[in-house]
Amino acid sequence: MHDAADACSPDSASLTPRRSPRHPASERARVPWVAWVRLITVTASMGVLLSCGGGSSISSPPGAGGTAALTVPSEPASHWTQTFLPSDADFPNPDRGFYSSTTWDFLGEWDADGVQRAWSAGRRLLMARVQLDAWRDADLPPSLLALLSQRLDQARAAGMKVTLLFNYDFSEAGQDASSERIRQHLRQLKPVLAANAAVIPFMRAGFIGAWGEWHSSASGNSCTGRPEAAACAAAEAHRLTVRDALLENVPETTQLAIRYPADLMRWYSDPLQQHRLGLHNDCFLSGPSDTGTYEDESQRDYAAAVTQWAAFGGETCENGELPVRSTCADILAEGARYHLAWLNADYAPSVVVGWETQGCLARVSAFMGYRLQLDALAHPGQAARGEELVFEVALRNVGWSRLFTPRRLVVSLRHRETGAVWSAAAGDLRDLPPQATSSSRLRLRMSLPPSAQPGLHEVWLGVPDIFEATASDPRFSIRFANADSTDGQQAWSVAQGRFRTGTTVEVH
């Protein structure tokens, strides 16, 4: 079987690094959708992908989505125009959603039963907290690096990815390390993080201060005085050292989350000038300031803007400022405003259970992060060997946030008798705008060689992972937010990690 994910490894893909800077917010209203969603058209021969890059062009088809599927005709169709039925079901998907904490220390005993329970509950993210208090004044030992690599591999084997946090003091005391020691530790961690990038979509900035939340540092990495004071100037220099070390040593495919928007505002006056540093709010929906997260409304506006392209996650809390904004109206409004991508399922329990009692927990779970919906597909129903096939796919992202991990849309032809599969890929699906109310169209071109096997081929669509370690594992494929058709022609295959469209191509 030949698959696009096998042909384009992450190292050779044109999907990373991301393009920046982005359009300023003041200009966004004047920029048409054609400028916001980049299309990579890929030309492929049957059986081998020839290119992973290409030109750009997109349009938005009118009235896409919401129509029942067509059935396969008794004779091969000359041209297919297929539509798909959206679904509001809460489909678990990688790189997004509620996360679970199965162990206090990620390097402690592996809780296989707890991880399995999390998987069965629909979780696809684990909290991975790594305690470094024993090495505040020393290099990390090889044994720790090896154990971290082992735990990340165990997460992958369980079908899970992680949101990673390194800290020296998970208490209010804030007994952390110096910025130079933190930088050295990150340099040591770099090879392990790079080798396991496939399972680390999110990482809190961590390391500094109490709970790794960048406040109350005992090593001068934070301050509480006036910004112009000497101690605060020194703390800012230390924070920049750690920020730069994070950017240099954490894989570019991993979203980094800073605790406070004030830091991002000092570093990047334009919220759209960078895309790697997002936010984690660990007292989400708690009081007027989210318990010190925001100093004023301008910081909330900045957070809403920066998370258009960088990830926002965290947890709610029970012992913060009052009132706690724990109603369904609160989470549905602020989840969308801040493009919420990942959130603690276990804390605060009173808040999460409250959403369930009020009847919105399933919707929060379904729309947190990205949510890709197929609207329509058009392609010829017949093709001669040696000809080029063009597939046009209309889809949209109706989730609260965009995709942050590189992904391509893959079209596959599966021979109905032999089962042979041929694939081609296109697009950088991170560029699909979130909360979309109209669809974007991606065009894929596939050249059929003279040696192509004749016969009827089913057309499938999928979004596999791009990393070698996970590309062929259907558990890491993105499930579309579409219902199976009642006639059985359109259906998601759990075993294959892709969607049968109900259309065919007769190759002759």
Question: Where is each model-derived feature located?
Answer:
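N-terminal secretory signal peptides that target proteins for export/translocation
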Residues: 1-35
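C-terminal motif of bacterial Sec signal peptides marking the signal peptidase cleavage site
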Residues: 50-51
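Boundary/entry segment of secreted carbohydrate-active catalytic domains
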Residues: 69-124, 129
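Aromatic-lined substrate-binding rim segments of carbohydrate-active enzymes
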Residues: 113-169, 179
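An active-site-proximal structural segment forming one wall of the substrate-binding cleft
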Residues: 144-156, 177-202, 235-249
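Catalytic-core regions of glycoside hydrolase
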Residues: 202-209, 213, 217-349
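Catalytic cores of secreted or luminal carbohydrate-active enzymes
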Residues: 327-379
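Extracellular/luminal regions of secreted and cell-surface proteins that mediate adhesion/ECM remodeling
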Residues: 365-508
